[in-house]
Regions:
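N-terminal, positively charged nucleic-acid-binding surface of large information/translation enzymes
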Residues: 35, 45, 54-140, 494-497
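Short, basic, low-complexity termini and linkers enriched in Ser/Thr/Gly/Pro
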Residues: 2-34, 378
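Alpha-helical recognition segments enriched in aromatics with Gly/Pro capping
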Residues: 35-69, 84, 155-364
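The substrate-binding groove and active-site-proximal loops of carbohydrate-active enzymes
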Residues: 114-121, 145-151, 263
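Active-site pocket-lining segments that scaffold enzyme catalytic pockets across diverse folds
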Residues: 132, 137, 142, 161, ...
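Structural preference for alpha-helix termini/caps and helix-kink/transition segments
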Residues: 303, 310-500
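Short, glycine/charge-rich beta-strand/loop segments that flank catalytic centers
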Residues: 103-107, 129-132, 142-157, 175-184
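Short phosphate-binding/catalytic loops that engage adenosine nucleotides
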Residues: 95, 169, 486
Length: 500
């Protein structure tokens, strides 16, 4: 009897456990079934390809962060907002994303600026790292899993340099340890360059009369007076720029992972150097499945950069341009294309944001009809069709301008219904807006009481008159709306309602 009771208790426990496991399996299957396949343009292959996680539905992504010696400018905003929206989409699409961004907190530029400011380099770097992270918070960049300082991985950097020396990919000079690019057959392939053309690059390349090849870059710099330094097997020194990123990515992701991103000016030599280092160390190819690069943000015909002195800091820009508008401005251009920063473009983004946000709040605050109507099924089907198209545009090369075009078509459809929405239609419409905000991070709830049903009915009535080209009647309804304390504005994207 005792044995039977024990069996019964065990069976009950097992049943509970089995139910729990069944729920987990069901949820996991639902999650797998909802995963959206994604195609991305790969800089390395110059074509779009399907993203294939090495681990089940998990994406590891590394993006080159800032060198923290000054305030970040809106060129940085363009890059980091674009990647923020991309990672938001990956997560919405059902993927688990580990997104790491490095902080270059030791570099020649930091040392030079610290000397100019009569500061300790570490203090200068900490100051501007703090300011950068504050800028990202203000820009609603929320997707980064972890920031990693280069100086937090000195041990890993030394390990990589040591292994490159052992494999004969590196050599000693009086001023440091250099990578021999002639030893890496594919050097320059990422950018369609050769090792001999390295000196033509506009980005940082280490100069030394002791180098074997013009394109060779420094892995470990010998210590100089009054500069930060760390102890190594080769004496005191500090890391070169390129080795910092591979030390971080190898530590967290291993020698191969899914996505590496940065701005287009990092393709050569920086990202090519990373490939040369990591593939030489591991013997595995490719280091990264897909390389993503954001286009320049331009002022006139020039890219915005600190070196050219034509930059606007993020905090200065945000004095007149809210984060929601700046994010929509950036989403309006394909991430890998150049984008022109001009007042007319910002104004267009401002107007587009007003249209989207106004419609969102109109639906959110309206009194929905309680009764189901005969058109609800058709209306919901159309909304879900637009929602599906929106996701499809993002899944095909992360084409944000095409996705936004779907959003404006959807808004016009909602306006064309010409009546207050049923509960079912309103719920479907808000679900689509949730998708829009999940990816773009642009919606802002109005702090208003619900829009009275009489007003939404008047707006719908006016829209019907406009659709029928009954302009006099539409104008009369507009005046009624205005007398009630609201304004209705007509734009190319449709009508917007706001409180006076």
């Amino acid at each position: 009897m005792k044995h039977m009771i024990q069996n019964k208790q065990l069976t009950t426990s097992e049943k509970q456990k089995a139910k729990s496991e069944k729920r987990k399996t069901k949820n996991e299957k639902r999650r797998r079934d909802s995963i959206i396949p994604i195609k991305l343009y790969n800089t390395a292959t110059k074509k779009k390809q399907i993203l294939k996680p090495y681990r089940a539905n998990t994406i590891r992504m590394f993006v080159c962060g800032p060198t923290v010696y000054d305030y970040a400018h809106i060129g940085h905003a363009r890059t980091y907002i674009a990647y923020d929206m991309f990672v938001r989409f990956l997560r919405m699409a059902g993927y688990t994303v580990a997104y790491i961004q490095n902080i270059t907190d030791i570099d020649d530029k930091i040392i030079t600026r610290a000397r100019e400011q009569k500061m300790i380099p570490k203090d200068l770097a900490r100051k501007f790292e703090k300011e950068y992270r504050a800028d990202m918070k203000n820009l609603l960049v929320i997707s980064i899993s972890r920031y990693v300082r280069a100086t937090s991985k000195i041990k890993e950097i030394i390990s990589q340099v040591k292994r490159l020396l052992e494999k004969k990919y590196a050599y000693f000079t009086p001023d440091g340890i250099y990578y021999d690019v002639s030893r890496f057959q594919d050097y320059g392939k990422l950018a369609g360059r050769t090792a001999l053309s390295a000196e033509d690059s506009i980005t940082r390349i280490d100069e030394s009369v002791q180098k074997r090849n013009k394109g060779d870059f420094c892995l470990w710099k010998s210590a100089k007076p009054q500069e930060p330094k760390w102890k190594s097997p080769w004496g005191w020194g500090r890391p070169g720029w390129h080795i910092e990123d591979t030390a971080i990515s190898e530590h967290f992701f291993g020698p191969q992972y899914e996505i590496h991103g940065g701005a287009v000016d990092l393709i050569f030599p920086h990202h090519q150097a990373e490939i040369a280092q990591m593939e030489a160390l591991s013997g595995r190819k490719p280091m990264v499945q897909i390389w993503m690069h954001t286009g320049f943000l331009r002022i006139g015909k020039e890219k915005m950069s600190k070196s050219l002195g034509n930059f606007t800091t993020i905090r200065d820009a945000m004095r007149t341009v809210p984060a929601h508008v700046l994010r929509l401005f950036i989403a309006s251009t394909l991430y890998r294309s150049p984008i022109l920063f001009h007042e007319s473009m910002i104004q267009q983004a401002r107007e587009n944001w007003e249209t989207i946000n106004s419609m969102y709040n109109t639906i959110r605050l309206m009194h929905a009809r309680i009764a189901h109507n005969t058109n609800a099924k058709r209306e919901i089907s159309r909304i879900q069709q637009y929602q599906k198209q929106f996701r499809a545009m993002l899944a095909d090369g992360f084409n944000t301008p095409r996705a936004l075009a779907i959003v404006f078509t959807y808004i016009k459809f909602i306006q064309s219904l010409g009546q207050s929405l049923s509960q079912e239609t309103r719920a479907a419409a808000l679900e689509f807006f949730t998708d829009i905000d999940t990816v773009f991070g642009i919606l802002q709830k109005q702090k208003l009481s619900a829009i009275p049903r009489t007003i939404t009915n008047l707006v719908a009535k006016r829209e019907q008159f406009r659709n029928n080209k009954q302009w006099q009647q539409a104008d009369a309804v507009r005046k009624q709306i205005e007398r009630a304390g609201y304004c209705v504005e007509d734009t190319p994207s449709g009508s917007r309602l706001r409180k006076k």
